[in-house]
Amino acid sequence: MTEVKFYKGESIPLELHKVRVVQKLHLVPIERRMEAIRDAGFNTFQLSTKDVFLDMLTDSGTNAMSDNQVAAMFQADDAYAGSQSFFRLQKAIEDVLGKKYLLPVHQGRAAENVIANAFLQKGQVVITNYHFTTFLAHVLDKGGRIEELLTDEALVLRSNNPFKGNMDIEKLEASINRNGPGNVAFIRMEASTNLIGGQPFSIANLMDVRRIADKYGIMLVLDASLLGENAYLVKQREEAWKENTMEDIMKMMTNLADLVYFSARKLSSSRGGGICTNRKELYLKMEALVPLYEGFLTYGGISIREIEAMAVGLYETLDETMISQSPAFIKYFVEEAGKRGIPMVTPPGVLGAHVDAGTFCDHVPQTEYPAGALGAAYYLISGVRGMERGTISSVRDENGVEILADVELLRLAFPRRVFTLSQTQYALDRLEWLYDNRKLIGGLKFYYEPPVLRFFMGKLNETSDWPEKLMVKFRKDFGKSL
């Protein structure tokens, strides 16, 4: 954000936008919240928004759209094939991401499906800085496997390391030599690594990854869903790039990759997704898969109106005052929570503020899902919906044994230009109260566990009457307050 100093020295994020269309919210009583979270199987994904006050589940598809995006939707050229809206999007992709060939898809996981079908063979490995849930599911579904090669410090939750999303270059080369270059389907780098706290990689690291990829003739794929935020943090934290524009930084990152894919629900504050490249042979390997899985090549299963909004949103990603808004609010939340003793992932990343649930609920065994329990407890006492990013979001091995997550986090997402400062302060206040009463939180156990992506549809029971005890303490401290 553009720096604005306050007279009395306060350091608070300043919104450089005004609110013109609003949606009414409801803060229901804790008794209703108890019914809602129990009906949801203590899974915040299963909550209905009518029972949610602040929806901090995700930034995917929930970013505020600009007036220019909404206006662009009215010029949509509704055509099954050859829509002019597609060509406007194609130009935006070339202008912003520097890629000539575009395949539209309905969202990010659809891009993952197409890429996995085109380039991954059974038994091959995909090397990545860190997995994302849906990407891992697609790789496993195709009979592949993943190797995650973060640096050792990346999983130190509280540190000053500005680029925890970096790939360990020594581990990368060792992995290629161990597996054999022909058995590596591709190398994947995820911008603003989601599951470890929205942590970025540096351009220097991406250059090193590119060098190794070239040495062994392996394709480099970039998940650019959170590219704008990664570029912003590069500008803030990487000395060599502090004087460069957002456009310079984003183009440098995409130019280093053979293939770029993204969820427009994040990157451009719209809905949809895309795969783009400058290599025609890669485009042709994927081309037939888009009509098969998504829709014709000029709409890819996306509403034409959303294609128009996507094009405008891509250009707006280059606006530093827009892209910095969410990271600024996250930084404020993390720093204020830290002052209150609440364990948070540092340095502050993107997507959201990440609570270290493993430390917050260190009395809850990891096999009883401390991050999921914290998410349920936080909703119960606040009406705020966060997302579990821990062992519930993990998988079981081929023998049905739980694979414990590397970290147990509760993510409180900050979609772009959605929440106000007073709402942020409310979320902080309730989190502080819960931390002071954290020993009341207990564990969870599955009673319905789907075999794939269980964190979406799974349902759990509490392991004791801890939710009732938490509600009693809330009423004692807050009286009749919502």
Task: Name each region found by the language model.
Residues T277-N278, V355-G358, F414-R416:
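Short beta-strand-to-loop capping motifs
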Residues T2-F42, D55-A64, Q69, D78-L102, ...:
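Conserved PLP-enzyme active-site core in the AAT-like
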Residues T298-A309, G313-A376, L380-D406, G442-V452, ...:
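Conserved small-domain helix->loop->beta segment predominantly found in fold-type I
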Residues S393-L482:
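PLP-dependent enzyme catalytic core of the Aspartate aminotransferase-like
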Residues L284, D362-P370, R417-Y426:
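Short, conserved charged micro-motifs
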Residues G272, V350, V407-R411:
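Short, solvent-exposed beta-strand edge segments and adjacent coil->beta transition regions
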Residues V22-P29, S66, A373-L380, E432-L434:
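C-terminal, active-site-flanking charged/polar segments
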